[in-house]
Amino acid sequence: MSASPAANTFGASAPPANMFDTVPGYEGTLAGGGGGYLPPPMPSVPMPVPEQAPHPPDWHIPSISEERAREAFATYVSSNCCYSSGPVTDGVITNMQSFNTYRYRLETFTESRSTEWSQEPYSGQPVDAGVQPAPGPWQIAAQPPPFFQDQKQAIKVPFTSSIKNCHVCLGMGNKPCTTCAGAGNKVCWVCNGSGSRLNDERCSHCNGQGRENCSSCSGNGSSQCDTCHGKRQLIVFINLNVKWSTEKEDFVAQDLSGLKVEKLEKVSGKELFKDSQFMVYPVMGFPDASVAQASQRIVRDHQTKFAQTSRILQQRQTIELIPVTKVNYTWKGNPYVYYVYGNEFEVNAEDYPATCCCSVM
């Protein structure tokens, strides 16, 4: 008689809560993470002294020439396969108006720390739990990358590692085969378990048994435990996950040109002001009041928000002047508009009049 499938008495894949020891300073640590970022200690560096933003002699960028506007327009049209060049060659420019668009940007480079219980097969690694108290999450040294370069690092917390029986295979090193449920055999796929073919001849594939050896476990009924890799034991420890990230926020002063603000996200401008230090102070004395107000709001928000769960390592604020030129032109007696913007001379022409249908063969 063939073996019946074995009942699944083995442990769940998720480790039980009592598998992990209580480590002072790490009481909220969970397996697999999810405990959130840990609040950092109070900063030891005092707040910087307010500095007034400098006043450059000229806040304005000269408007581009008509020839440069046409060149940018021609490049834009040639990059669109469904645009004909008629408006470029025959269009008549009737007016060009330049707008100075200021973009304020604050970047806050932070270090965040979280912990999680981790495990790996035990192969003789050092075990140090209880030898001495584990250092606190923010007492462990971690070398940060250069400022504003995002990076992650996992550090094994000293004096937290211990040995436990594998919770998945219950310390046996193997587990029932999931294909045959531990029986070592399964229903013959040729005769569907009947032992004979359609003409009542004995099934040659299973020799009339109606079952065949399981190919997944070679008939053993079990396979090596994927969690402990057959070692029967696990070494469990706390991992400190350190994350360095740059939090960025922009403000673009409205210039009344009509160009959508999101078009400016991927272009650059002329850098008018740059300030980088541990914690910056809001820009003061800038000619455009909306930029100064945005700086006050964003700096306050960043220092309040990120200081709760992260350590602020550096802040950098810049003000760029992004050139925007609105070009009015006529073609076949009708008025149209396009914009040339950024140091890259990008073009936006939403009402381009000479388009055709394209099809891909």
Curated annotation (Swiss-Prot):
Domain of life, source organism: Eukaryota
Name of the featured protein: Protein SSUH2 homolog
GO CC entries: cytoplasm; nucleus
Keywords annotated in UniProt: Cytoplasm, Nucleus
Keyword flag Cytoplasm: yes
GO terms (BP aspect): odontogenesis
Role: Plays a role in odontogenesis.
Chief subcellular location: cytoplasm
Compartmental location: Cytoplasm; Nucleus
Gene: ssuh2
Inactivation phenotype: Morpholino knockdown of the protein results in increased incidence of agomphosis (absence of teeth).
